[in-house]
């Protein structure tokens, strides 16, 4: 199954699961007018095809006192050390997103911290990585929205 093999039923099932991954298949089936078995089989096919990679929780980090979000551009001294640096960054729990980029920086990451002192500590930890030549930090003053599943609304079937 490829993206082009999704039909309207698959897309509607995805819409329900994107809204709430814990929606029972029977509830999805009832709302769609199909059997729960059909929902189960189609979800399994989308999982097998790698379209559905699992389910996850959305955590409100502000409720856990992680109120400070910073984006960090990382310039490496040697670009052939990118994978090595990514592994090190992956080991820092406050680094919540990592991307290899073109342009001014080799790597771009998102960090969540409790406050400016916590963010400073994490940025210093990143700067201490041997292959890191320099970093540039951008403080998020407001997260307007964060929706990793938003694109599904634009996928055409």
Where are each of the predicted segments found?
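A compositional/biophysical signature of low hydrophobicity enriched in polar/charged and small residues
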Residues: 1-157
């Amino acid at each position: 199954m490829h993206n082009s093999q999704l039909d309207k039923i698959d897309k509607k099932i995805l819409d329900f699961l994107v809204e709430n991954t814990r929606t029972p298949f029977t509830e999805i089936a009832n709302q769609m007018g199909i059997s729960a078995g059909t929902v189960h089989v189609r979800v399994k096919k989308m999982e097998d095809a790698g379209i559905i990679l699992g389910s996850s929780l959305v955590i409100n980090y502000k409720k856990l006192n992680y109120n400070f979000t910073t984006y960090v551009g990382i310039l490496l001294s040697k670009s052939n050390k990118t994978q090595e640096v990514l592994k090190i960054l992956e080991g820092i729990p406050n680094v919540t997103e990592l991307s290899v980029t073109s342009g001014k920086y080799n790597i771009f990451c998102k960090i969540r911290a409790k406050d400016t002192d916590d963010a400073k500590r994490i940025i210093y930890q990143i700067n201490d990585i041997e292959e890191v030549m320099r970093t540039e930090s951008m403080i998020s003053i407001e997260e307007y929205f964060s929706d990793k599943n938003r694109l599904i609304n634009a996928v055409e079937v």
